Swiss-Prot record:
Signal sequence extent: none
GO MF annotation, one: rRNA binding
SUPFAM superfamilies tied to this protein: Ribosomal protein L4
Protein name per the record: Large ribosomal subunit protein uL4c
One Pfam short name: Ribosomal_L4
Swiss-Prot/TrEMBL keywords: Chloroplast, Plastid, Ribonucleoprotein, Ribosomal protein, RNA-binding, rRNA-binding
Gene Ontology cellular-component terms listed: chloroplast; ribonucleoprotein complex; ribosome
Organism of this sequence: Guillardia theta
Chief location: plastid
Subcellular location: Plastid, Chloroplast
Gene: rpl4
Family to which this protein belongs: Belongs to the universal ribosomal protein uL4 family.
An individual GO BP term: translation
Length: 223
């Protein structure tokens, strides 16, 4: 991903969260983080490292020694009028080896734990100013339909547009929620044990469960 796209992710405008209790807005909590340190610079740095670490690095080309065939000299050294050639595997020949081509490698780049934690803290802080949080704890997942979830979320989020991304943040025990969001293209789900900086920055609206909200506050309010 280019540098401009990364900067666009970091510079997302702060979006409002939505409040919900039993799929309504009668009561809500807020994500008010008490943090002393924030770093927009680390947002870019940690996000860049995250994208780099996701690269597979499996591009591979063959050198002249790895190309099949080419063991016989194409023509004799002198007397033909052609340039001298020793093998059809030469990089000068079509179908020959590649000079200095890419080989499988790792692009992994270490990110310090404190830096990653501060970047997540900054992202959550920017997203939490004057926001509300959805409480899904009393939601009956056994009878919930994906279609109903889409309709309710679109009705609850003010000025919601179809191209806006919604991110659910839940505790690991709320695995049943994944069944209802996995088929929606602009809706994603992450758990508090694996907060994803890129997804947080990309999201226009973030929906917390009550348990996930408490877990996030417990960790990030100490920063």
């Amino acid at each position: 991903m280019g540098s401009n796209k990364i900067k666009n992710l970091v510079q997302y405008e702060i979006q409002d969260f939505v409040s919900l209790n039993k799929m309504d807005t009668k009561s809500h909590d807020s994500l008010n983080l008490n943090v002393s340190k924030k770093s927009r610079y680390l947002l870019h740095r940690v996000l860049t490292n995250q994208l780099i670490n996701n690269r597979s690095g499996n591009a591979c080309t063959k050198t002249r020694s790895e190309v099949e065939g080419g063991g016989k000299k194409p023509w004799k050294q002198k007397g033909t009028g052609n340039a001298r050639a020793g093998s059809s595997n030469s990089p000068l020949w079509k179908g020959g080896g590649v000079t200095f081509g890419p080989k499988p490698r790792t692009f992994s780049n270490k990110t310090n734990k404190k830096e990653r934690l501060l970047a997540l803290t900054t992202a959550l802080y920017l997203k939490s100013n004057n926001t509300k949080v959805i409480n899904l704890d009393n939601l009956d997942f056994t009878n919930l339909k994906t279609r109903d979830l889409v309709i309710k979320c679109s009705n609850l989020i003010e000025n919601y547009k179809k191209d806006q991304k919604i991110l659910f943040v839940a505790e690991p025990t709320a695995s049943g929620l994944w069944r209802y969001v996995k088929n929606i293209s602009n809706v994603d789900l992450i758990y508090t044990t694996g907060l994803d900086l890129k997804k947080i920055l990309q999201a226009h609206h973030i929906i917390f469960t009550c348990k996930a909200l408490n877990d996030v506050k417990e960790v990030f309010n100490e920063q």
